Amino acid sequence: MAAAGCLYRRTSRELWTILLGRSSMKDGHQIKAELDRYGDRLLQGLAYYRPPSTSSTGKVKANKNLSPALQELGLRLSKFLGLDEEQSVELLQTYLLYDYRGTQESVKGVPQDERQSQALMLKASMVDYYYEERISLLRCVLYILNYFQDDKHPYSAEFSKCVEMMEQKELFGKYLKQFESLCREEAPTWETHGNFMTERQVSRWFVQRLREQAMLLEIIFLYFACFAASPSDLLALTKLFKEQGFGCRLQNRHLVEPSMDPLVERIGYFSVLIFLEALDIETLMTCSLSDKTEQHPFSSEEQVCKEMDSVLVTLGDAPHHGPVLLAWALLRFALNADKVTPTVRKMGSTAIQLHIFQYLTRMLQSLRSGENNCTTSTACLCVYTFLTFVLTNLEEQVLQSQQDLVDTAFQVFAAPNLPDLFWNMEPTAGLGILLDSVVGMFPFHLSPLLKLFTALVSKSSAKKVYSFLDRMSSYTEHYRHKPHDILSHEDETLWKRQTPKVLYALGLGQTNLRIPQGTIGQVMADEHGFLVRWEYSYSCWTLFTCEIEMLLHVVSTADVIHQCQRVKPIIDLVHKVISTDLSIADCLLPITSRIYMLLQRLTTVMNPPMDFLSSCVDCLAALATRMPAKVWIDLRHTGFLPFAANPVSGHIISTEGMNAGGYGSLFGIEQSQGEYSITLSFLRLVTTLVKGQLGSTQSQGLVPCILFVLREMLPNYHRWRYNSHGVREQLGFQILSLIHAILNLSPEEEESTSTPNLQSLCIFSLTNTEAGQAVINIMGVGVDTLNAVMLTQAGSSGTEGQGQMLMQTIKLAFSITNNVIRLKPLSSAISPLEHALTQHGAHGNNLIAVLAKYIYHKYDPSLPRLAIQLLKRLAMVAPMSVYACLGSDAAAIRDAFLSRLRDNIEDMQIKIMILEFLTVAVETQPGLIELFLNLEVKDTNEGSKEYSLGEWSCLQVVLKLIDSQDPESSWGAPLLHRSAIAFLHALWQDRRDSAMTVLRTKPNFWENLTSPLFGTLAFPSESSELSILETCAFIMKIICLEIYYAVRGSLGDSLKKILKKFSEEERFTYWSNYVHSLVCQVAESEGACNSLTEYQQLLSAWRMFLMVATHNADVMHLTNPEVRQKLFKDVLGGTQALLLVPRSMTCLHLGSMLCTVMIILLRRWKSDLAAPEDILSSLTQILEGVLQKDQQLVEKTKARVFAALISALEIKPMKASEIPQYPQLVLNVCETLQEEVVFLVDHTRQEVPANDASEDKDSMETEDTGRIRQKDQRDGVCVLGLHLAKGLCEADEEGDQWQQVLRKLPVLPMLFSALEVSLRIKQNLHFCEAILHFLFTLAKTHQGAAAMAGAGVTQTVCLPLLSVYQLSSNGASTAQPALSLRKSLDAPSWPGVYRLTVSLMERLLKTLRYNFLTEALDFVGVHQERILQCLGAVRTVPSLACLEEADHTVGFLLQLSNFTKEWHFHLPQLIKDVQVNLCYLCQACTSLLHSRKMLQHYLQIKNGETMSSTATPRGQRTPQTPSKQPTAESEALELRQLRSVQHSLLKILGKTLATLRAFTPDLCQILQPLDLAQYNLLFALSFTTPAFDADVTPSFGTLLATVNVTLSMLGEMDKKKDHPLGQVLGETNSTVDNKNIKSLLLFIMENCFYLLISQAVRYLRDPSVHPRDKQRMKQELSSELSTLLSSLSRYFRRGGPSSPAGGLMPSPQPKGASAAKVVPEAQEPLIQLVQAFVRHVQR
């Protein structure tokens, strides 16, 4: 806007908001500064707004900062409003800035657009704004006058100085002139104010003037209440009041409409009050009592008094005149009774005839109906003083009706402090005279005394009222005729009873009163008989009880109405006493206990007394605040409340069997009459019972009542008939208050009953029935309607009245909807409430848009705050676009949001809520957040996009809030600062790259963001603001996310400097100490802190910060070992402190969080940590503390402690003696395992379906991970506990400690039982693998292996292991997932379980040998098919999984081959099959190793590549055109796969040949006589190299080919380091060492030669072989071996190593393998052996 920068003056509405404390300016110094700055405006009042002038017009036209269109519009507005031109332009600018409903961009076009300019005035928006400014100015003055003497008000001192200034500068005179000006102002016309001044505008102008007149008079009244008025001031006022007829003869009275009558009456009332206050009656009474009337100001102003007489003598024709005439007449009489003129006497008599007390009653009722503020209290005090003056100076008989006087007193004493003032006065003066009068007529006239005492009850006087009525000394009754049992005095002034008299005709035994014999009574005769006042002492409370009993007796008679009228004041008094002082409730039990019977009896009469019943219900509601359970129980027996005929079922929606009770019949009568006093009382009663937190059983009884409200009242109350204005709004407020109370009940403990509780009932009804739509309709009232109601309410304060009631109702609807959405159970279906909330309407006509537009509401900041809070909730849970719902108003609403966010005086809570809403929108509302981010995009020369912040971007505001150098930043408001940082965190968390890019480029962004991390925080206390902890937590998370997202090199220099500074200034140490101190504080308080949320946020962020720091130590400069040790020590200490606290879920949760980061630090910083002994000692204590807690609550924590112990054991190898408390630690782990395994087995048996076994798949090749159950997790307690047990077992090298534990606890039987169950049903995969790993470690020692064998390990796993795999028809599955897509070979799988079991059998057999042989043979017998299938599958399925299983299988067979005789005896056929399959396996491995291309072909097929169908082992590949060329990464992956497979094949081949040696004759024995029948011929007598794709019988050619392959591989490794195999096998990062590979190749070669020689000798010595074949064999062997010897000799001459298993090979000339490299090649044992054999066959 053109001149927006010129706006420096605060608007009157803003000033009023500041004074009310609804802004961010809450400090007294700020208020003083505002009052000093704008005090002159307050002093001027409405005169601040000047009329148009020529000079002002010239200044506007000369202002170059104003556009011509804005000047023109300002001048037109000046004429229309009759306002100074400069002020009109300023008013227009502020309106466009603060109240205009369009976008700020469109503001510039408003002055140029004729239609929009006219709309500003024709639609009265501009006029309303101007009128509101004028009213706000007067409200500021009123507010200051109301509270400048209130010591409890926070700004009373500042207000007092302002009032002092205004009093010195003659506030009264200025405001009196303004009032005169308003009274005499002519109505505007179209000639004077332009064509826009229509009749409607004139009417609105007149209403505004009436309101201003009333407010000016109210200000003058309050001013006179504080400062004395001079007689001349009063004379001037009186003349002015007479001129305008106390509001009845206004200048423009022809414009008065019926709707304006309350304002006209208000003007008259304040005129009267000003007159009474200006007389200073209190001073007059004080002077009269001391006979110093000459000290009164009017005593010396005789001329003024005469003029006043002449002015007032003509009055008397209007009700307003009564108090004025009587007060003046009494003043004249009090000042000089002897000189009272007839004129004055006439004034007094005229005043009495005007029914002044009825007038005063109406006046106080009218003032209190709209609002009940300080003005009303001051008016009551003024009238109280007047009544006291009147009663002191006039005889009561002169006053008309005693009842009118009591009614006035009833209204007077409604003001606070006045009852106390009355009780502190003399009982014979003032209103004490009235009290004595009504006491004298009691109980003949029952109502006056009760009404007066009802008004006199206050917190400090309730007991006085009770005591006064408890000791009544007289009893007045009326007789038409003189009774016979009376003795009378001669003059009939005294009577004496001759017989006692029972006062109430009640039955025997009932409460009653009895006047005893001889009682004296004073007689006052009247025209109707005798009025006797007996001198009889009694308790009025007993009399009240008798009156209620009488009512119960006459319920069914015609006297019931009359008796109800007598009893109703009693009930009202009891209600007031109980609600004021609950301690008296017990004393009133005889009365309150009879109210239940009254309700029961009176609800059934023909015409129930509705007001009386309403009072009864109100009384019970007050009583229920003290004893809700008793009231509920007693009330339930009456049948008054709705009830369920049958027990409440679990069907919430059903109302079957519900009865409306006695209230239901009354409710129908009220609907027909249009009066709802009982319904309001019923709602108050039920609300009180709900808030009373009844027990769950009693709360169930309230379900019918709540159902009645939700089904009958809430959906329909707005359609009922109403006789009185405002009752509908009051009903809606009460209904919503009840629902709000229910939704805010503290959660009850879960019970087994299926009946619904009150909360679930409300939630279900609101989400699924018409009740929810009714709440939506209330929220849909809209800001325009609400603002209109607020403008039209008659009250002056703006903080009370009908508009406030509507506003509170809408706020309740917001809160209820928010709570319903928050508390409703999760469901996939959309409820009717959610559908109605989120449905789109045309032209923005939907609830979302209505909610968003509440941002335009300016009166109460809590209303838009609650609306935004509901928007936030809907944005979180509702599947809709807020942006789409806003439609074309979206940009304007955004500008309104940001305007309030930018405003430096805006309420802080609104700003916080706006930021929280935007924080949620980042994740859930992409369109809306883009609107608020308002990023402008520019295309750069490089073709990329460059972002910048738009003028109306929320980031502009957020950057300003976090700027520590900006005076308007949020650093003085921690909660606002936290919200701003939380919004930035949401941007990073949702990875809004465009916004992040812009923010990174902003200067000092990272410095401003991270400033809190470099400050020194005070240690938190109960009273400190802890949002700074959350702020720091969000900052840490933003840094972590930035490092995570950005490549290390792309981090901004600014952030790099910050991180370096963070390290250099030792902030790691500082924050570690701070977090550690917080943790210790929580531990010391056992989790009973009030700030756990903030602590948890900071702890979570610190945990993330450390995790990122461990992975990016160089970026975050966390490389100092001492700092690392310090951080880990604090984490470990904090974890220990928290987890050792017993019975605290909070400490357990926080400790579990710390335990996670401790595990990571243990794994990442192993080399920098201190000795593991100290760490293990602390972890052992932590484990003991955790094990003492409820085990169902600490399952995850136990798992994390186990993981930490595992990591600590991995720091360095340790023996059992070096581990602190090793025996106890082992015992704790085993005991925990025992409990967890039992639970796991039970859980498995319950959860697993019966048909699980049928779903098992062929597991030879598939990585079937099974269905991981909830309790069987990789990081579960059982699995980690077993891994920890494995680590502890490895430390016990001798096995002694574990032997003791195994003897003490049944660990092994329990584990075996669980393993058997899991294997049998093929569940708990991770658990099975962990058990087998533990057992494998335990089997390393002889004691452990023996214990396992003794516990029956074979019986446990042998047969159940069959369930793990299932053979296919062809023995192997051909479907295999791609190798590159498969998990690591070490990942849990059922084939892996089988492999581990085979390895375990191998280990046990190796350790126990003959002691385990029988079990081993049993295992082989059971699984022989699988074993044979595995050996044969290598040729067809050369995958890592298959090769790994073959490796384990051959290893087991290698151990078993040491017992060939026993094996042959038990399983003769199997040993033959194994021999055959081993030979074929040898041939398959050799073929695959020989043809690398064929092996690559297999791997590529498994990786999904298309191969040529004509490929041969030696042919060239002719692949189809691939979709993309192979990359360096894919080639490297293929090379690694090839390396792994080749290494596996070599290991299998070595073990296979070693196993076959057991089935061939020993070379040392075969030369001697030997039974050849026990050794089968393993290889065929053929020397042809077998083809891979042919099913060729293994032969000598196979062994020779194997030797050739090994020689070839050895040669390649030595010659070509750049060869693929050499590169792969020679990689420094490879797990396979080059030297070990060579040794393995030599081992294979040795075994080949051994088998070759042994089998050849076996052929030579076999008589069944033809000599010709033997001769051919010799020739072939001689030739082949000679060739191989020459190649072998060349290899050894180059320095090749000898086989590490050379000692295993028997040689004719035994040589040590250790000298292989230093002796000539001829001395190699291998070469010597082969040479000897060649010489032998050549002979």
Swiss-Prot record:
Claim: Electron transport is one of the keywords in the record: no
Biased segments, Polar residues type: 1506-1528
GO cellular component term, pick one: nuclear pore
Intracellular or extracellular location(s): Nucleus, Nuclear pore complex
GO biological process: mRNA transport; protein transport
Domain of life: Eukaryota
Region (Disordered): 1249-1269, 1506-1530, 1696-1717
Record note on disruption phenotype: Morpholino knockdown of the protein causes abnormal heart and gut looping.
Composition bias type Basic and acidic residues, residue spans: 1254-1269
Keywords, alphabetical: mRNA transport, Nuclear pore complex, Nucleus, Protein transport, Translocation, Transport
Function: Component of the nuclear pore complex (NPC), a complex required for the trafficking across the nuclear envelope. Required for proper protein transport into the nucleus.
Annotated family: Belongs to the Nup188 family.
Subunit organization: Part of the nuclear pore complex (NPC).
Protein name according to UniProt: Nucleoporin NUP188
Organism name: Xenopus tropicalis (Western clawed frog)
UniProt gene name: nup188
